[in-house]
């Protein structure tokens, strides 16, 4: 975890100068998912440190929404996944939780990264549980489906590198809640900051 003094020194103004550009997201989802851990997710005056992510690899991935393209209602909602990387994909899960993702890779790949957990950085207090889970991420940062398809390289919603932050220790395991996905349920596509108190689930299952 970042030292308290270091966290307190971070400001949104400083983060804005270290915004991650769209080109950075033009890579495979599993690569981006791993490297987003330790970066900041910023929305307006609030920011959290990404501590847990999941990668979704396209239409062949049995857990990915990209597999629904061309199948009725899924087409409109999930078409954003086939656009260029660096764009937000926000959807409602089980009629309750807004889920925030970033599209990755070149257009046509259908890949995305789900932000599963953040730790408070700016404007979120000090409780590590505030962003512990994807539904809490969006609640903490004030995100919902109005932010779907937003360009994360412009505007007040973006990812940023944290200056002088050491690379966090990364743990890898299967994604959560995808038992329906057959063999894909056991693929090691969840990445988290090892032993961080803000992670939604620290074990591999």
List each language-model region with its residue ranges.
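Conserved, well-structured core segments that form or line functional sites
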Residues: 2-205
């Amino acid at each position: 975890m970042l030292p308290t003094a270091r966290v307190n020194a971070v400001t949104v103004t400083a983060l804005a100068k270290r915004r991650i550009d769209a080109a950075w997201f033009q890579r495979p989802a599993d690569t981006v998912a791993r490297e987003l851990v330790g970066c900041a997710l910023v929305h307006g005056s609030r920011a959290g440190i990404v501590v847990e992510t999941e990668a979704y690899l396209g239409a062949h991935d049995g857990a990915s929404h990209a597999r629904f393209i061309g199948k009725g209602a899924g087409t409109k909602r999930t078409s954003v996944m086939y656009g260029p990387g660096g764009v937000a994909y926000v959807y409602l899960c089980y009629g309750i939780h807004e889920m925030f993702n970033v599209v990755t890779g070149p257009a046509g790949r259908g890949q995305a990264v789900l932000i599963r957990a953040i730790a408070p950085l700016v404007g979120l207090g000090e409780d590590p549980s505030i962003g512990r889970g994807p539904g809490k991420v969006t609640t903490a940062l004030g995100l919902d489906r109005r932010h779907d398809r937003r360009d994360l390289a412009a505007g007040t919603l973006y990812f940023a590198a944290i200056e002088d932050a050491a690379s966090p220790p990364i743990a890898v395991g299967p994604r959560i809640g995808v038992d329906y996905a057959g063999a894909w349920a056991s693929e090691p596509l969840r990445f988290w900051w090892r032993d961080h108190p803000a992670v939604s689930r620290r074990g591999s299952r």
